[in-house]
Regions:
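Histidine- and aromatic-rich ligand-binding microenvironments
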Residues: 2-6, 40-41, 97-98, 120, ...
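Alpha-helical structural signal
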Residues: 7, 28, 45, 65, ...
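Acidic, PIN/NYN-like endoribonuclease modules and their adjacent C-terminal/linker elements
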Residues: 105, 110-133
């Protein structure tokens, strides 16, 4: 099983005050138990680290680096993927869409991944299945 991990899921796992913290923790543990391949881009990782530091402090960053990064397969964004993400962002023309999400969509299509661990409606709008359902 291969699952693409979004920033929204990683932040929900970390933050006990997040409205979806419990389902996020449960799914995270289930994916680890199944030894699922957990994939994200370096852009997702940078976004997650920046938001975690801003919202929860350096201790959250340390937790990510120590406990989460080792179980992730980080796909480094290639130049062509970056620009494909920019083109997708511009073609969608939505102010609340992010470049990080668009690059995630490009990578998911390239890798043939249909499921995303995400609490972000943009993934479903792009035709992906969000976990948890």
């Amino acid at each position: 099983m291969r699952v693409y991990i979004d920033t929204s899921a990683l932040l929900a796992i970390l933050n006990p005050h997040d409205r979806v913290h419990l389902p996020a923790r449960e799914l995270w543990q289930a994916l680890l138990d199944k030894e699922a391949m957990l994939i994200c881009s370096n852009y997702v990782l940078v976004e997650t680290l920046a938001l975690a530091q801003r919202r929860m402090g350096l201790e959250a960053v340390q937790t990510i680096v120590r406990d989460i990064v080792p179980v992730l397969q980080v796909e480094w964004v290639e130049v062509d993927e970056h620009w494909a993400g920019v083109q997708l962002l511009l073609s969608l023309g939505r102010r609340r869409m992010s470049l990080v999400d668009c690059v995630s969509f490009v990578q998911m299509r390239r890798l043939g991944i249909q499921e995303a661990f995400a609490f972000d409606e943009h993934f479903e709008a792009q035709g992906f299945t969000c976990l948890p359902q």
